[in-house]
Amino acid sequence: MQGRRHRQTVIRDNLHGRNDYFFQTEMADHLREAGAAFYALDMRKYGRSLRPHQTIGYTDDLSVYDEEIGEAIEMIREERDDEPIVLMGHSTGGLIATLWAHRHPGVLGGLILNSGWLEMQSMATWRGAMAPVIGRIAARSPMWEVPSGGTGHYGRSLAGRASSELDIPEGLSAQDPSVAGWPIIQEWKRPESYPVPASWLEAIMAGHDTVEKDVHLDCPVLSMVSTSAYVEEEWCERVFTSDTVLDPVVIAQRSLGLSDLVTIARFPGKHDLVLSDAPVREAVYATMRGWLGAFIG
């Protein structure tokens, strides 16, 4: 998605998460108005790039995405010459973006993470115990489905507060997508997600291991997370103000080691912060604009 050209334009290449695709056009509009040229990428086997014969979202090697990210950046460079590139990633896309930045030093002007999946929910202790087990399973049965659990609250919350059977907080417009529901193509973003193959999870945990042991980037990082996690079965107001997928405390802790210049920002919002209530979204956009102006612009 391309924006208008401005003096000191900042280039953004946005990477979505698992069970996801780019539809956050409000975020793109806000950043274009702030002077950024915004581009988004649906990675292979996701969203607009998904083909009928493909297994949605599947890979056993996260570096495979280097190809399309690299091609996208080359295309941006052809149009935007030497303007700074800021890579942004949400959830799994945040992990992929971080690893790409690690493998390509000197390319990025900055990295923005929106609930970036930098570590398993129980930190490296759980990963260290589980990785050998998952590795053995993946070697024998790559597509074996790992039980993933989860409450399904996040997908349900995206249908909006109006259908939630909960009280709608004062001040929220009935027309706002956080109330009316986000316009989602369910073929590309499924309410209950889809199976987790063992070989895919092995690749994710290998990425987490690299982040923990090897990643130290040469660019500033903005890591945005929710103020709280909520993983209980009860359907309540907290599903709209918490991360119901990942642990934001773990993400923030892991983010601190990504670079010498790391900004942590917390918001009372959902797993994808730009799909939260309108006041939270405005705070997220303001934080990104301020950070870009301070460290990139």
What are these regions (language model features)?
Residues 2-43, 50-52, 238:
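Short, surface-exposed "cap/lid" segments of acyl-processing enzymes
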Residues 18, 42-47, 117, 268-270:
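Short beta-to-alpha linker loops that shape the active-site pocket of alpha/beta-hydrolase fold enzymes
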Residues 19, 47-80, 84, 281-284:
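Catalytic nucleophile-loop/oxyanion-hole region of alpha/beta-hydrolase
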Residues 39-41, 114, 265:
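The conserved SAM/SAH-binding core of class I Rossmann-like methyltransferase domains
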Residues 92, 96-195:
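Alpha/beta-hydrolase-fold enzymes
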Residues 148-261:
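Serine-hydrolase catalytic core
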Residues 261-297:
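Catalytic active-site module of serine/aspartate enzymes centered on a nucleophile-bearing elbow/loop
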